[in-house]
A protein has these predicted regions:
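Acidic, polar-rich low-complexity tracts and alpha-helical solenoid repeat scaffolds
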Residues: 2-7, 14-271
Length: 271
């Protein structure tokens, strides 16, 4: 009888240990998250955090909670508080970098605090072993651009070019540098930036390059090349409507210029 009781006690102990295993709890929390049971997911992640405070699983749990608040429940203050708790308690962890990226996105896209977003990107770049360093540098440059600090943005973007950025990110860097040159009215330099992206495999980048090229030639009053740039857009129903509309507008503008009427050229009409 004593042996039976002892075996039963051992089994109960093992089961209790399994049920409270942090990895198991994190899996259960993830399942609740996928099911849309967000409060249950938060409760389970909090359980892991409270049991594993200071450990790697605790950091994962806090990041999960912050993401649920931010991405699903849209409780931005709770998300910010949770991410800040994570970066305070888990400095140097992989989760700190992820939390700071989310904080930067909230400040940039939700709160409109560009200064704080840039500060978060700076802190990320100070972390050792950042995997997506060039992407973070580009996001920081975009924040400088949105803030109107074009020289800072240009400096950061040129640094990326010097590092030898490639692929889709290279296209984005060239487009953004070209936008800055447009704003600075350095149109010849802007042209070379947009021409680099004309044959990009990215449909959206290619489209933006054609539109910005058209704008730049228009600013130089070279309407023939502006029309050629817009005509060379990829064939699609959406683009065809844009092509027809822009050609009509360019022809009208050319007539106005030739007649001595010089309406102000709108800047940055295409994102």
């Amino acid at each position: 009888m004593r042996k039976v009781v002892a075996v039963a006690f051992i089994l109960l102990t093992v089961l209790a240990a399994c049920s409270s295993d942090p990895r198991r709890l994190l899996s259960q929390a993830e399942a609740k998250w996928r099911e849309g049971k967000y409060e249950d997911a938060i409760r389970l992640n909090n359980l892991v955090y409270n049991r594993e405070r200071g450990g790697a699983d605790g950091a994962v749990a806090l990041l999960n909670i912050g993401n649920i608040y931010y991405l699903n429940l849209r409780r931005l203050k709770d998300a910010i508080d949770t991410y800040n708790k994570l970066v305070d308690e888990y400095r140097g962890s992989a989760e700190e970098g992820k939390a700071r990226q989310q904080l930067a996105a909230i400040y940039l896209n939700e709160v409109g605090d560009l200064t704080q977003a840039i500060s978060e990107y700076d802190r990320i770049l100070e972390l050792p072993g950042v995997q997506n360093r060039q992407e973070i540098e580009f996001l920081r440059a975009k924040a400088y651009f949105q803030k109107g600090e074009y020289n800072m943005a240009l400096q950061a973007l040129r640094h990326l070019e010097e590092e030898g950025v490639t692929g889709h990110l290279a296209d984005q860097v060239s487009l953004k540098i070209g936008n800055i040159y447009q704003i600075q009215k350095k149109y010849e330099q802007a042209l070379s930036c947009f021409q680099k992206v004309m044959d990009s495999p990215c449909i959206d980048c290619r489209r933006r390059a054609h539109l910005h090229l058209m704008e730049t030639y228009e600013a130089l009053f070279d309407f023939e090349k502006a029309i050629a740039a817009i005509r060379s857009l990829d064939a699609s129903p959406e683009n065809q409507a844009v092509i027809s509309r822009e050609i009509a507008r360019l022809n009208e503008r050319q007539r106005e210029v030739e007649a001595g009427r010089m309406p102000r050229l709108p800047e940055g009409r295409h994102p």
